[in-house]
Amino acid sequence: MPVKALFKPFYLGALELPTRVVMAPMTRSFSPGGVPNSKVIEYYRRRAAAGVGLIITEGTTVGHKASNGYPNVPHFYGEAALAGWKKVVDAVHAEGGKIVPQLWHVGSVRRIGTEPDASVPGYGPSEKLKDGQVVVHGMTKEDIQDVIAAFAQAAKDAQSIGMDGVEIHGAHGYLVDQFFWEGSNQRTDEYGGSLANRSRFAIELIQAVRAAVGEGFPIIFRFSQWKQQDYTARLVQTPQALGEFLQPLSDAGVDIFHCSTRRFWEPEFDGSELNLAGWTRKLTGKPTITVGSVGLDGEFLQFMVNTDKIAQPASLEKLLERLNNDEFDLVAVGRALLVDPDWAQKVRDGREQDILPFSREALMTLV
């Protein structure tokens, strides 16, 4: 099937993407002190030069004391980190690409001993999980407002250094998603209980980001059913419930939904072939990004279990068919782009035989 659908421009207000190929956010941990360096700049520049229309950066921590959970991940606060990101922006723009930061708070995933302040524990919606296990500092309402303010400031900073929008990380069992999920949200106030109440934190956060950046500055929201704490978890079981969950987020100011799945080809609900991005587009009318093992014959978790496994390039025929049918608008590519910065150009040129396979070793280097 012709690949031209991947390489058509995409327009959303003032945002113009040269192609439908999106670089998925992937934690890389190559920014000592939280500052993106020359290797990080070149890493992103190479993808833009080879035909990636939109780069969503690796997760970048907002300016809250408990936002970070891992060593050497980049910050999105402070003079040095923002100056580093400005260099990344300029390099990507010079190649004709667009770029947004993924704004991130890890929540209860954080552990005592983590930089930058080792004394700070993880923060979560409530100190106990559904099974009663005490895991974190349960957030007060003041804590909630502090985190919301940190996201709003990060978005404003992104706009000021020339980023083309922002993505809010609301997926995979990190803080925003911890509020969504009843397994981690045991609050009894207006931020807990029903899914509508558990969504209140995200809604207020999105509203604050929108107020900080004004109209016309794109806000992408990434969400998932699955959690790193439970890969079988599901926030909703039916299309109706999905629509009820997403509409308030859309109304709060989301422009594009990034629908995270482990395998893009899997139907989200019985009775339809639509995946999560397809249903989200149908229910909200907003553009969507699909993601999940694009371009490879094996999903990510297999490489955590079997370190010798190699994922070979896979056919894009089913992906292109869905894209041509307007099931979704944009396609996020993760590991295939991580290992091969020229992936998009090779696909465009019909050089599939030259695409590099993925192995776990690729995670250890920045190319």
What are these regions (language model features)?
Residues 1-367:
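Flavin-dependent oxidoreductase catalytic cores
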